[in-house]
A protein has these predicted regions:
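Two-component/phosphorelay signaling modules centered on CheY-like receiver
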Residues: 14-32
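The feature encodes the CheY-like receiver
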Residues: 59, 77, 89
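Acidic, metal-coordinating helix/loop segments flanking the phosphotransfer/catalytic sites
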Residues: 33-51
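Conserved acidic carboxylate
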Residues: 11
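Non-catalytic signal-transmission and effector/linker regions of two-component phosphorelay proteins
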Residues: 1-6, 113-127
């Protein structure tokens, strides 16, 4: 039996986090949920996720700064990172892309099924 793919869900809004957590768990993923950038960096090393679903606007350390640190840390530099954010301006997308994000999804422009499909795509799974 193949082990579950591990997703690190980084979202400071607890309602949004619980919705994404529940749906991804239903899809068969093993989920670890954290609520700020500091927790995200620690969990990325401890949990060893297959993919990080990362909010941009968070307390303590922004998602952009988390992404920058992940990409400059040997143990995490190759992790797949999908940014899921309310920030819809091109400058924000370009900033994330310059930092090495694998995908950038704007919350107001996607439904949860789209998020699941993008996660599966980046993990090489059938959609």
């Amino acid at each position: 039996m193949e082990s579950k793919k591990k997703i690190l869900l980084v979202e400071d809004d607890e309602v949004s986090a619980s919705v994404y957590h529940a749906r991804l768990e239903l899809e068969g993923f093993d989920i670890r949920e954290v609520h700020n950038g500091e927790e995200a960096l620690s969990a990325a090393l401890d949990y060893r996720p297959d993919l990080i679903l990362l909010d941009a606007m968070m307390p303590k350390i922004s998602g952009f700064d988390v992404l920058d640190i992940l990409r400059n840390t040997p143990e995490t530099m190759n992790l797949r990172v999908v940014m899921l954010t309310a920030l819809s301006q091109d400058k924000d997308r370009q900033r994330a892309e310059s930092l090495g994000v694998d995908d950038y999804l704007v919350k107001s422009q996607v439904v949860i099924g789209d998020v699941v499909a993008r996660v599966k795509h980046h993990l090489g799974m059938d959609i």
